[in-house]
Regions:
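Glycine-rich phosphate-binding loops of nucleotide-dependent enzymes
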Residues: 1-211
Length: 211
């Protein structure tokens, strides 16, 4: 990301921000609430458009118009407020909107296969794919969100304050999983305002203050 600027009315949220994130690393963004961390990542994922600046992914210029476009280019952002459908199963949530079909019919064998592969990568294979998401813990629901991103081929995973609702045990499991994703070549962007967490999980970090 090069020279990113974003204003909301008279408030300058981001002012000439530069950021490099590499494959196979956990890169943290740290700063107080309102520093611009989430806004910067919303621009990367397509949820918000920059006023000025450039984004490059794998050497290609990238101008995301919306989150669907961002995911198609390989970028997924997991928010504090999860966007799952609680009445649907784990596997239905993982492939929601991208269900393999033939004509008007869903290909359930392919759904089971693809969802199962994503669940194994994210350590969810102890759960039945048919389990309703509403019955899962917050930590497990977070993993379903990550599995959804992995299933569509995203290689840049943005986690926005992911530990805010987790116990210490769940945090340790999440950090272990983040390390596994890094070792598989994923670029993980970790947004936090807790310096101790950043020291524990990140390979590099950038600080933001007032954009």
């Amino acid at each position: 990301m090069r020279g990113i600027r974003k204003a909301f009315g008279a408030t300058q949220a981001l002012d000439d921000v530069w950021l490099d994130v590499l494959p196979g690393e956990v890169h943290a963004l740290i700063g107080d609430n309102g520093a611009g961390k989430s806004t910067l990542m919303k621009i990367l994922s397509g949820a918000t458009q920059a006023d000025r600046g450039q984004i490059w992914i794998d050497g290609q210029s990238f101008e995301p118009h919306d989150p669907r476009h961002g995911r198609k280019a390989g970028v997924a952002m997991i928010y504090q407020e999860l966007s799952l459908a609680p009445h649907l199963s784990i596997e239905e949530n993982i492939l929601l909107g991208i269900e393999p079909s033939k004509g008007p019919f869903l290909q359930w064998d392919e759904i089971h296969k693809r969802a199962g592969a994503a669940m194994r990568q994210l350590g969810l294979n102890h759960q039945a794919p048919s389990t309703r998401v509403a019955t899962l813990s917050i930590a497990e629901q977070q993993l379903v969100e990550l599995a959804r991103a992995v299933a569509v081929g995203c290689r840049v995973l943005v986690l926005d304050e992911p530990t805010s609702s987790l116990s210490r045990t769940d945090i340790e499991r999440l950090f272990s999983l983040i390390g596994e994703l890094r070792d598989r070549g994923y670029a993980v962007v970790y947004i936090s305002h807790f310096l101790e967490e950043v020291k524990e999980v990140a390979d590099r970090f950038n600080g933001l203050r007032d954009g």
